[in-house]
A protein has these predicted regions:
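Single conserved hydrophobic/aromatic residue that forms the stacking wall/gate
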Residues: 1-12
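Intrinsically disordered, low-complexity regions enriched in small/polar residues
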Residues: 3-4, 100, 110, 208
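Second-shell loop/turn segments in exported
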Residues: 15-22
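A glycine-rich helix N-cap at a beta->alpha junction
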Residues: 23-27
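Second-shell residues forming the walls of enzyme active-site clefts
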Residues: 28-184, 188-201
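Extended, charge-rich helix/loop segments that form flexible
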Residues: 203-209
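Charge-patterned, long linear interaction tracts outside catalytic cores
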Residues: 209-216
Length: 216
């Protein structure tokens, strides 16, 4: 995956993790990356929906609130996701809260994940939560609540990283929780990317190149 939103300041905002400042340039460069990944048999995941470039806080460490108008977010941040919605295998929503749109961070917001991503953008791929162990997610509730909220909001998969005990709690919390459209999720999982035929790949050429490098 690779962030599709322009970045403004430090941490994610002013790093080399975004392609460009212009959303149309981001979309075109993203299209090229998706094409290359698809050729290699790798699904592309766009993040962080709907955009992470309007805040300076690091959501790993703190709450992040984007107070911009919805129209600006849609025109700038969401545009690359809209252009690439049919070619992305997955999308990862952010833990940013967009105050003019919803009271919940995007990862826990049906308004973002269902109304906008699924319905308006017609995204048919998989939705992966961002790490539910991040500080901005912890403010929503305990890990059990976070897990259920993320699934109810529209996440197909939830991530709980770097904390095995929380991962166990998350699994237990959803063991009897109704997971909607399980069969559809599995179908999407195995059909969101066209696996290439390896009959005419350049693997022999690559192996020969590696052999030459190793021999020098």
């Amino acid at each position: 995956h690779y962030p599709l939103r322009r970045q403004r300041q430090m941490c994610i905002r002013d790093s080399d993790r975004a392609f460009h400042k212009d959303p149309l340039a981001i979309a075109e460069l993203g299209r090229c990356l998706v094409r290359g990944l698809t050729y290699a048999g790798v699904g592309a995941v766009g993040k962080h929906f709907p955009g992470h470039g309007g805040v300076i806080e690091d959501t790993h460490l703190d709450e992040a609130i984007d107070n911009r108008e919805v129209a600006e977010i849609m025109a700038q941040d969401v545009l690359p996701f809209k252009v690439l919605s049919s070619s992305l295998s997955g999308v990862m929503p952010s833990h940013v809260r967009y105050s003019k749109f919803d009271t919940q961070p995007a990862c826990f917001s049906r308004q973002w994940l269902i109304d906008i991503l699924r319905n308006d953008l017609n995204f048919q791929g998989l939705v992966f939560s961002d790490d539910l162990s991040m500080r901005a997610a912890e403010l929503v509730g305990d890990v059990a609540s976070r897990s259920r909220l993320a699934i109810d909001a529209g996440c197909d998969f939830i991530l709980v990283c770097n904390n095995s005990e929380d991962a166990d709690r998350a699994l237990r919390s959803i063991s009897d929780h109704r997971l909607n459209n399980d069969q559809q999720i599995m179908k999407k999982m195995f059909s969101t990317i066209d696996m290439p035929s390896f009959v005419n790949t350049r693997s022999d050429e690559y192996k020969a190149s590696l052999s030459r490098i190793e021999s020098t």
